[in-house]
Amino acid sequence: MARFGTQKLYIDGAYVDAGSDATFEAINPATGEVLAHVQRATQADVEKAVESAERGQKVWAAMTAMQRSRILRRAVDILRERNDELAMLETLDTGKSYSETRYVDIVTGADVLEYYAGLVPAIEGEQIPLRESSFVYTRREPLGVTVGIGAWNYPIQIALWKSAPALAAGNAMIFKPSEVTSLTTLKLAEIFTEAGLPNGVFNVLTGSGREVGTWLTEHPRIEKVSFTGGTTTGKKVMASASSSSLKEVTMELGGKSPLIICDDADLDKAADIAMMANFYSSGQVCTNGTRVFVPAAMKAAFEAKIAERVARIRAGNPEDENTNFGPLVSFQHMESVLSYIAKGKEEGARVLCGGERLTAGDFAKGAFVAPTVFTDCTDDMTIVKEEIFGPVMSILSYETEEEVIRRANDTEYGLAAGVCTNDISRAHRIIHKLEAGICWINAWGESPAEMPVGGYKQSGVGRENGVSSLAQYTRIKSVQVELGGYNSVF
């Protein structure tokens, strides 16, 4: 018997059985334990969810802004009250250390929901005078029923990042979590209902992206799709969304982000930043700065500082609060990361740290890969060009500022970038030339609710978080009013 039994779909404010008996397993990647059997939604379930969302959205949109704001704020309170319980469930399902999920995943997701709950009454139109007898006013109206499709690395946080602006603007959302990590999103649906969200305004359908995701993105009555995942899949989602009914889309996709360390940087601080940019969440963060550019004259000193810090990583049971490095999200993903590590060795990169699966003792039960650092890397290596999504850092040396900017931009991706320097003018000069949507100076990784995040090039379309994202969940209606007479040419 799985610890959490059978997990059902969440439609119209309640758990309901899927239209078939098909299920998939939720597996703890630290131990291989089957946590739950999760039901697979059918196409008929998708129709039920859409119909439910359409009904609920009308009720939700008819509420006053303050009523909607209060309900979302109650959901924030419940999330914070249940933080530790939800964090442990996230740890079991994803393998991320409890020392991370307890202080980041639910906390930052709740922050985003609170941020948008506060913005609900600020959704306003404009009044535009034309002449003495006429003016135009605009209304920002909700889109209707929207879809969120999540990734497996931050399940509940991503669900909140997508649902918060959608619900704040008066829409309903049908959310499909990753098949790999579905459990906490179902709990979020419970919390929204407990907070007073009308039935149907947040539905959760579990299943594969190939089936459930496609049925949702192609559905003619869905108005917008917000997707987080790989670039290849994102292109397919975007194509199906546009070909079916010209849906609006937001895409948060892959990256191969550069971290540039300048010759005047504090090397200890730069090493700390590089560690967070590569090994936080066991390297499974879309914005990770996996291409670390270091001045050639400083490379040996930087390598020594990185090796010293890697040795301090505490890999282990993610349920132990002392652990700060857990397994990868699945055994399948572990094999993918190990194949990249093998490719790096084959192509001539030098292994500074790690480079293998962890198998001693209890590690053998889980999907653990050692924190890995390659050095003497070149731009044409597979590990430097392709997104690995694991704990693999590549160190590259450079000579001049002009050279490193050119090489940093020589990628199909443009999600994130960072610069370490004590010269603030230099920092801004370099950042302004980097082709990336999310940038940090002397820091890495923080994405507060107020900060719009999203990529350039193949890394995405649109933004999440910040004021601008709220507008993406509305459409503008323009109304001209004539107070005087009307002259016809006929």
Swiss-Prot record:
Cofactor, how bound (note): Binds 2 potassium ions per subunit.
Residues given in the record as K(+) 2 binding sites: 246, 457, 460
GO biological process terms, semicolon-separated: glycine betaine biosynthetic process from choline
Chemical reaction(s) catalysed: betaine aldehyde + NAD(+) + H2O = glycine betaine + NADH + 2 H(+)
Pathway: Amine and polyamine biosynthesis; betaine biosynthesis via choline pathway; betaine from betaine aldehyde: step 1/1
Enzyme class: oxidoreductase
Cofactor(s) recorded in Swiss-Prot or TrEMBL: K(+)
Active site (catalytic residues): 162, 252, 286, 464
Extent of the signal sequence: none
Pfam families: Aldedh
EC number in record: 1.2.1.8
Transport in keyword set: no
Keyword match Transit peptide: no
Function statement: Involved in the biosynthesis of the osmoprotectant glycine betaine. Catalyzes the irreversible oxidation of betaine aldehyde to the corresponding acid.
Subunit structure and binding partners: Dimer of dimers.
Protein name: Betaine aldehyde dehydrogenase
Organism per entry: Pseudomonas entomophila (strain L48)
